[in-house]
């Protein structure tokens, strides 16, 4: 995970290139349009949008929705933080988000299997 807001562009590009040269993929985490542009300039193949503002720790899924159109479909687009319900995932799917990173909802869950099934939309009757 490479955080675009922390790394300068040259360092970010070197890290992305090193990962690719080693046969690995790197998620470049962003939170703003400027950071998404930086990630695209350095050739990121996976771009994550952190919905949590690390300055005040507020969470807004609209961060992902606002930035989605900046990234072509050939780049994997990941929404990170603040995803708690199946409805959140359905909203993100509707906007062609390729993957989600779920941490807090799973960590707070007492029944992780059930929580994962609910998030995936698996009916208990199936």
Q: What is each residue range found by the language model?
A:
Residues 7-15, 31-33, 37-42, 54-74, ...:
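Short loop-to-alpha-helix "cap/lid" segments that border enzyme active sites
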Residues 32-42, 79, 83-102, 114:
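Catalytic cores of alpha/beta
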Residues 4, 25-29, 78-83:
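Active-site mouth loops of central-metabolism enzymes
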Residues 1-7, 48-57, 97-115:
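Glycine-rich phosphate-binding active-site loops on the catalytic face of alpha/beta enzymes
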Residues 20-24, 41-48, 72-74, 93-100:
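Glycine-enriched alpha-helix->loop->beta-strand junction motifs that scaffold or abut catalytic
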Residues 17-20, 44-47, 65-66, 118-120:
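Short, hinge-like loop/turn segments at secondary-structure boundaries
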